[in-house]
Amino acid sequence: MKQKLTVIVIVLLSVFGVKEAKAQGIAVKTNLAGWAMLAPNIGVDLCVSECSSIEAIFYKSAADSWLKNANFTALQFGYRYWFGREPLNSLFCGVTATPARYEMKIKDSKRKGDCLPLGVNIGYCYPLSDKLNIEVSYGIGMLYLYEDITSVSDQGEEVKASRHKTSFSPTNIEIGISYIIK
């Protein structure tokens, strides 16, 4: 999984042509919607030109989350195009990819798998002060899912199955706070 994430980071940086980081464009951020679901997260948004930025947010579920016996880890990557005069302070649209690995127990079955939501998003960053912003965004796209399911039959035997699924769904919901460092 770490190798896949490394490859994704390299590809994103190559595709979007990071040549220099702008002096006034580094922000530390967190998604409050994630915290509300007991998924602590921290991220960074880095301006790569006068009207674009890249972001990375790491999510890790809490030990006992809202879904009993659930555990997941995700790393969201994104590219944003800012329509205002300066990045990190206006309307934006972008693309996101969020590779994730999860393990959960639902009723009598255990599910373990990987998923990859790929989508487009739109949002707005509201400045509260020179350094502090509130950010709201929503994204839709495709969700690719592969999971192994282990359950117990009525006879008490362990039954294993695998499932691949592709669906159109929301890919991210963000109500976040960001603090501009530079």
Where do the model's predicted regions map?
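Short, surface-exposed coil-to-beta transition loops
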Residues: 38-41, 119
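Bacterial N-terminal signal peptides
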Residues: 7-15
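Gram-negative (and chloroplast) outer-membrane scaffold detector with strong preference
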Residues: 46-136, 174-182
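Sec/Tat signal peptide C-region and signal peptidase I cleavage site
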Residues: 17-23
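Extracytoplasmic loops and strand-loop junctions of Gram-negative outer membrane beta-barrel proteins
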Residues: 25-27, 103-107, 156-162
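Short N-terminal segments immediately surrounding and downstream of signal-peptide cleavage
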Residues: 25-37
